[in-house]
Amino acid sequence: MELFKGKTVVVSGGAEGIGFAVAQAVGREGMNVVIADISPDTLATAEATLSEQGIPVLALTADARSEADWDRVADAALGRFGAIHALMNNAGVGGSGSTGPIEDHSAEDWRWTIDVNLMGVVFGLKSVVPHIKAAGGGW
């Protein structure tokens, strides 16, 4: 798809699952792919797989809960590919703080879930959207 050629996407939680599948799909269509994930081992495997498929990839260890990590990801993406055109806020958890009876989970469990699933999205948007706008608002 010509629409994607030469564009750059940042995918959080991009080392496996839906994030990796999206990174792979848009990479095959010509996008530069920046995958950010908290798991260095899984990230290394994902980076190798995408590279072997000829997809331009930058893989960065990052915690979606960290605004500083998001800023670092955006800066690295710009440094490597020159612009950011799209963001897929995919990092998320469904673990200890979000399943089972509410009375079985601590406030810390819920804070962790909210920090990843909500604040991770907020920080991603805050760090990346200005660069998407600078690149023309996507495409």
Summary of predicted features, one role per range:
Residues 7, 56, 83-84, 132-139:
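Active-site loop of short-chain dehydrogenase/reductase
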Residues 90-98:
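Conserved NAD(P)H cofactor-binding loop of Rossmann-fold oxidoreductase domains
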Residues 40-41, 61-72, 107:
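The beta1-alpha1 cofactor-binding region of Rossmann-like NAD(H)/NADP(H)-dependent oxidoreductases
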Residues 98-102, 106-111:
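Substrate-binding pocket helix/loop in short-chain dehydrogenase/reductase
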Residues 125-126:
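A short, exposed helix-loop element centered on a Lys and neighboring polar residues
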Residues 2-34:
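Canonical Rossmann dinucleotide-binding motif of NAD(H)/NADP(H)-dependent dehydrogenases/reductases
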Residues 53-56, 76-87, 106-109:
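A glycine-rich helix->loop->beta "capping" turn
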